Amino acid sequence: MAAIEDSPTFSSVVTPAAFEIGSLPTTEIPVDPVENDSTAPPKPVRITCPTVAGTYPVVLFFHGFYLRNYFYSDVLNHIASHGYILVAPQLCKLLPPGGQVEVDDAGSVINWASENLKAHLPTSVNANGKYTSLVGHSRGGKTAFAVALGHAATLDPSITFSALIGIDPVAGTNKYIRTDPHILTYKPESFELDIPVAVVGTGLGPKWNNVMPPCAPTDLNHEEFYKECKATKAHFVAADYGHMDMLDDDLPGFVGFMAGCMCKNGQRKKSEMRSFVGGIVVAFLKYSLWGEKAEIRLIVKDPSVSPAKLDPSPELEEASGIFV
């Protein structure tokens, strides 16, 4: 998506297809909490944004269980290159926080971004607070849903969201051991959301990895999240990929090692999965924020255009009816 000019016209810059890297160069800016700095975030954040002057929508990105925000560098740069400012907080340190604590921390970071993001952006790069979206992977996908559903006690109630995207969201290890807050109701279309929602899943997420249990178990993964959404909603499942296959290659440290071996992984190139995830996010944001329906509808109509094999067939249920 191109930059929003400071005028009634949103965009005039033509960008490549959503699955390709966009036309805008990007940069990554780590920002840490600093005592006595009113512009510092409440949690460490990693900002990924274009370096070209313009005003861009904001996307909050929440990492998965025990993961690091910099594990997603390739995907975040892909999205940012299409004209978005990504804010990825680091919500855990040595040990993951409780589920409700994580959701409340996410709300605090969103408040910070709405007020102080500009102080940390490159010169002439501005955030358009009118368009703020939520994206999350794994437990972070569940966090994004929880925030959108109003479970972040810290969130400024005046802040609204334009779109919600869960990437292989996970709500616990089984139906009896779920992370707080318990947002799944196991009732179809029970989520009270009035924004477009996309859910991305993986075919290998519900599979055991030798003796290791599934990272995205049945009844707590993308299938249930999608069932509980109302139109407008979309669903895409990368059949040959696992829960961690969207992460960068060669992840550092012990956490990176564990991220590479805990889950059932696919045998295909991870770069294809990253292009798929980045492309779905870009195409769905264009659909949700600007009403640009061509790319997302093309993916649904002709799944072969996706870098990753999609099975079952993708779905897009619009509020005015079903498009297949």
From Swiss-Prot:
Annotated InterPro entries: AB_hydrolase_fold, Chlorophyllase, Chlorophyllase-like
GO biological-process terms attached to the record: chlorophyll catabolic process; defense response to bacterium; defense response to fungus
Record key words, sorted: Chlorophyll catabolism, Cytoplasm, Hydrolase, Plant defense
This protein's name: Chlorophyllase-1
Catalytic activity as recorded in UniProt: a chlorophyll + H2O = a chlorophyllide + phytol + H(+); chlorophyll a + H2O = phytol + chlorophyllide a + H(+)
Location of this chain's protein in the cell: Cytoplasm, Cytosol
Something else known: It has been proposed that some chlorophyllase might be transported to vacuole via the endoplasmic reticulum where they might be glycosylated. Unlike CLH2, the expression of this protein is dependent on the presence of a functional COI1 protein. Plants silencing CLH1 exhibit reduced size, and decreased levels of chlorophyll and chlorophyllide. Plants silencing CLH1 exhibit enhanced resistance and salicylate (SA) levels, and decreased jasmonate levels (JA) upon infection with the bacterial pathogen Pectobacterium carotovorum.
Coiled-coil regions, chain positions: none
Protein's organism: Arabidopsis thaliana
Induction entry: Induced by methyl jasmonate, coronatine, a phytotoxin produced by some plant-pathogenic bacteria or rapidly after wounding, with a peak after 30 minutes and a return to the basal level in the following 4 hours. Induced by methyl jasmonate (JA), wounding, infection with the bacterial pathogen Pectobacterium carotovorum, and with the fungal pathogen Alternaria brassicicola. Induced by transition from dark to white light. Down-regulated by dark.
Lineage of source species: Eukaryota, Viridiplantae, Streptophyta, Embryophyta, Tracheophyta
Main location: cytoplasm
